[in-house]
Amino acid sequence: METHKTSLVILFLILIFAVIHSGGAALRIKAESFMGPRLWRLCFVSFSLPSAIVLISYFLAHRYDGIRLWNFQGNNFVFLLVWFLTAISFLFLYPATYNLLEIPSVLKPKVRIYGTGIMRITRHPQAFGQIIWCFAHTLWIGTSFTLITSCGLILHHLFAIWHGDKRLAIRFGEEFDNFKKNTSIIPILAILEGRQEFKIAEFFRLSQFGILIAIGVLWWSHQYINIAVKTFNSSFLSEFFN
């Protein structure tokens, strides 16, 4: 049991993260009508961002905990595969970068139905981006802690698929029904069935270039992971969770 203590903690942190994100999404319509979209976005970020930072920090500090299931580190093919999958996952994970100024509420945040770009491949790109990311990093790290973390994150995103469709159906009605008919949850399925077409030109936009820059920055920043881990381990948060 002691071997998997940190795995239980990370599952608890994922649960908190999921409640904040999915709960915040469920409350959005009522909250925006009460306090306005900008103030609600700032309130939401003030809770979601710290929860994400704590979750990521704890994961980095304990990623090699538990049982070592396999070890492909040192294998150049696996190394390249992991970085390729990570890059692909970012293209799925961050469709929100299409409206960067809405994130800090510089522009008025607004719920939209996107029917272009990555949405032609799957209408839930963040879920499949997370699945790809989890597969890549579990393959590379190879510990039971990372495997359990990945399972927790994937379960959260599978719930978000159902929850997201339900919220959009309530909010947009017939418009979402038409969108649903022309898209698929499973990547590429709608294209293969002829309900959708792939347009490569829609991927050549400034936001996608920003994602490529982010991937490069992340590659560079991996050398500082140990510094981040030492900082977290010396903080009151590490003592609290221990």
Language model features: what each stretch is:
Residues 1, 65-73:
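Membrane-interface interhelical loops and short amphipathic "cap" helices
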Residues 1-18:
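Hydrophobic transmembrane alpha-helical segments in integral membrane proteins
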Residues 16-19, 23, 156, 160:
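Hydrophobic alpha-helical membrane-associated segments
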Residues 20-40:
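Membrane-interface helix-loop junction between the first two transmembrane segments
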Residues 22-25, 56-63, 94-101, 138:
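Transmembrane helix-loop junctions and nearby membrane-interface residues
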Residues 32-35, 71-219, 223-241:
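Cytosolic-biased juxtamembrane loops and peripheral soluble domains of multi-pass membrane proteins
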Residues 42-62:
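A generic, lipid-embedded transmembrane alpha helix
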Residues 56-65, 225-233:
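Membrane-helix interface motif
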